Amino acid sequence: MAIKTYKPTTNGRRNMSGFDFSVITKTTPEKSLLAKKSKTGARNAEGRMTVRHHGGGHKQQYRIIDFKRIKDDKTATVKAIEYDPNRTANIALLVYEDGVKSYILAPKGLEAGTKVQSGPDADIKVGNALPLGNIPEGTLIHNIELKPGKGGQLARSAGTSAQILGKDDAGKYVIIRLSSGEVRMIPATSRATIGEVGNAEHSLISWGKAGRSRWRGKTPHVRGSVMNPNDHPHGGGEGKAPVGHPSPMSPWGKKSYGKKTRDKKKPSTKFIVRGRKGK
């Protein structure tokens, strides 16, 4: 979507930008593809906070997205491009030949009226879903399955994609490069969708004021250096005191910069050919 700017009529409006929603063709969601979405305030069943800086936000309904794309040999028509408040990407409403409706992530260039397919014999064109082993090298893909039949898990945010680099000698795995720079092997029978996720301009939005972040369910991110010493390792001292430790610390007293957090014994590590950039 294109970016629109606002006149500086107030301090909050100054430097604010937003979407013009020019690519959105339908403003009301498909009722049969909606689900209830309850807010937890980032608290678990015991009432304890499990994630910081989450809470509040506008009420939303969840759009049920088809991440698996297993309805083979049925051509679907893109009925509309819709806004989804639950993600950065837009979504596309599909209507299959037999009347079944579903939502998919809207890739770049997909328009209302386009025909899309899924399955091993589908054409290599934007919006079609195929097994990775059937997609040629160099193709940009998104909504990538880590395990066959589990549904897409990688490259789902606005503007993201991965690229197919090749296959292993046995043909069991396909080598892809993710947007992070990581190169990894994925089973050739796992599915992915052709193209890159649309709405790449999302990263250019200037939210402008704190209230817009609160509407999105984000609460203030307080610096540890302005807390009391019993609340954070950086807290206390007179004025703008230094950290007081050999390296910056998390609120729980662990090193927060540069420490690797991935489990060394994680089974999927063997599928990573090269780590992320700078790692």
Curated annotation (Swiss-Prot):
Signal peptide: none annotated. GO terms for molecular function: rRNA binding; structural constituent of ribosome; transferase activity. It comes from the Bacteria. GO terms for cellular component: large ribosomal subunit. The keyword rRNA-binding applies. Residues 211-279 are annotated as: Disordered. The keyword Transcription does not apply. Keywords: Ribonucleoprotein, Ribosomal protein, RNA-binding, rRNA-binding. One of its GO terms (biological process) is cytoplasmic translation. InterPro entries: NA-bd_OB-fold (IPR012340), Rib_uL2_dom2 (IPR014722), Ribosomal_uL2 (IPR002171), Ribosomal_uL2_bac/org-type (IPR005880), Ribosomal_uL2_C (IPR022669), Ribosomal_uL2_CS (IPR022671), Ribosomal_uL2_dom3 (IPR014726), Ribosomal_uL2_RNA-bd_dom (IPR022666). Residues 211-221, 256-279 have a biased composition (Basic residues). Belongs to the universal ribosomal protein uL2 family. PANTHER family: LARGE RIBOSOMAL SUBUNIT PROTEIN UL2M, RIBOSOMAL PROTEIN L2. Part of the 50S ribosomal subunit. Forms a bridge to the 30S subunit in the 70S ribosome. HAMAP family: Ribosomal_uL2_B. One of the primary rRNA binding proteins. Required for association of the 30S and 50S subunits to form the 70S ribosome, for tRNA binding and peptide bond formation. It has been suggested to have peptidyltransferase activity; this is somewhat controversial. Makes several contacts with the 16S rRNA in the 70S ribosome. This is Large ribosomal subunit protein uL2. The gene is rplB.
